[in-house]
Amino acid sequence: MRPRRSHPRKPIGLALLLLLAFGLAQTASADGITYRSVKYPEFAQWRAACAKLPSNRMLLGQAATTKLETALPAFDEVATALRAAFESFKTGSMNPAANWVGGKPKAAEFFNTNRAYFLKPPIPFQPFAQKLQVPAGSEVIFHGDFHGDIHSFIATLDSLNQAGTLDGFRLAKPNCYMVFLGDYTDRGFYGIEVLYTLLRLKLANPDRVFMARGNHEDVQMIPTYGFLAECQKKYANLFNPALIGRLYDFFPVVIYVGSGTDFLQCNHGGMEPGYLPGALLDAKPAVAYQLLGQVTGGTFLAKHPQLLQSADATRRVFLKSTIRDYTPLAPMTPLINGFMWNDFTVFASEPGLGYMDGRGFVFGKTGTRIVLNASAGAAAKVRGVFRAHQHSFAVNPMMRRLVAGNGLFRHWHEHDSLAKADATAAVLRSECKLEHSAGRPLKDGSVWTFNVAPDSYYGKGNSYKFDTYGVLTTGAAFADWKLRVVNQVIPVLKTLPAGQ
């Protein structure tokens, strides 16, 4: 993880810039395409192709080669799905002006996939928030970071097919939705397969599958963390990164999932006090959108001085000078977006607001409560946070709790403390009463972090082979909402040799 909160704009490399420019030129005649896969018309064929791929953990540490195995030998298969997705975004729930709070973005900019903020002449970078209001009794399936782990993704879809939730790529159960929490590529060798699978789900269920934008959904990240290299090895100069870059612009940085007047903030990173969703949550459409516009963190701090007071006294001057109003020009320019980057403390005794160099702001229990309270509308309330992002290759207190909690951790456990930071899983479960059962109680003001998929550096470094997804069932009142955690050992990891 790289940027500081205040981050000077870093020029995109010339080679990538040329690739992006060429790619956008190629999209000019893409309008009106209807997606249909000839190679993989059904999920079963796609599943079989992915099953032939070696695991990420088998490939880690091997000498670099000029070629990578892929289930998508021709980039055209991906490009066709991407262009169909663009049409779906343009003509679906984003199309009616009535679904946009504060005004619909310009067709010649936001919806013009032949232009981009990362090229000249640039169009504005326009991050946005989404509301997804579902009927009481609905199921919403959540998954955290994949980071190029196609085997865990396929295992999740297998599980949902076996449960009757999915029929292939199609959601078979009524009032069932899927929300993915960002970081789909980088740090793994099958990012393109993960993106393609997301697109297949989205195209089969355009109004029920949604993807949040993580910090790795950024054209400035992919040259550094592996996705660009992966695709160049698979497709050489046939790879079209501009299509990928524009896809990311249609992913909301935050999705407020709710029923009635109760909502959960669902995003990749953490809190962003510079955007308050009250007007969005009070809007009449069940699916609604709002551009973030100017991010007004400095204004929030002035109106809510208790947030700064919740910080350690030695950090307040720095925090006050760093949290300021700004207009976003790119995901990390001039400042990083908190929904994509920020984190949370592990223990309730830690400060309500802090900062970690290389990642961003860290919100504690009191600071989070302040922002959640301010996020309410006239009737709507934000009850908590579902997110991902906060993972490490190395064993640390957060990863210990994610693994001991069977892939889902509720921050600020009542019986946990800094004194038990490095406790074993057995101690965390017995003495700290760390939640690890399938059913989890939802508490007002709680923050939940989903683990990263296991066929990865993270799984290897922290010695786990199971993947996790959550099933949220909404109710007429927030007290009736239920959360179920599903774990499964990934088949390709069962026979890994020692050390992998």
Task: Report the location of each language-model feature.
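N-terminal secretory signal peptides that target proteins for export/translocation
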Residues: 1-9
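Bacterial N-terminal signal peptides
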Residues: 13-23
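Sec/Tat signal peptide C-region and signal peptidase I cleavage site
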Residues: 24-29
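Feature recognizes metal-dependent phosphohydrolase scaffolds
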Residues: 30-500
